[in-house]
Amino acid sequence: MQTGKIIDHMVDLILANFDVDAIYLYGSRAKGRERPDSDWDVAVLFSVFEPDLYERVLRPQKVEEVLQRELLMYDQVSVVDLEIVPPALQMNIIMGQRVYDRLVPHVRRVEYSIISKIEKDYVYD
């Protein structure tokens, strides 16, 4: 399956099973520098923040499980929650490809917050 079709299928699967505001592809595939054995690095911005820590940590794993099972890509897909990874990885993610955007203010607020954190912590330090 071609890269574009795989991405479209991933987006469709995520939207059919989870409530998300944005989906990102990052890493080597987002930069067009993938190798045949490169994994798919995907980040999701869930629509609702999960207050329960256990459930919050499990959510990206559940997305990963659906993608791996439905696409038959076991150990080839890695999914993270944009809001709970470290700021440097957050910046890497939003500098990748946003492959889905629900066009709600939440997406821009989170992205601007990430940029502000990076500027504060790394640029103007």
What label would you give each PLM region?
Residues 38-40:
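Short, conserved active-site loops that position catalytic residues or coordinate cofactors/metal ions
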Residues 43-47:
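Short hydrophobic/aromatic beta-strand micro-patches
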Residues 1-22, 31-36, 49-125:
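Catalytic core of pol beta-like nucleotidyltransferases
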Residues 28:
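Conserved H-loop
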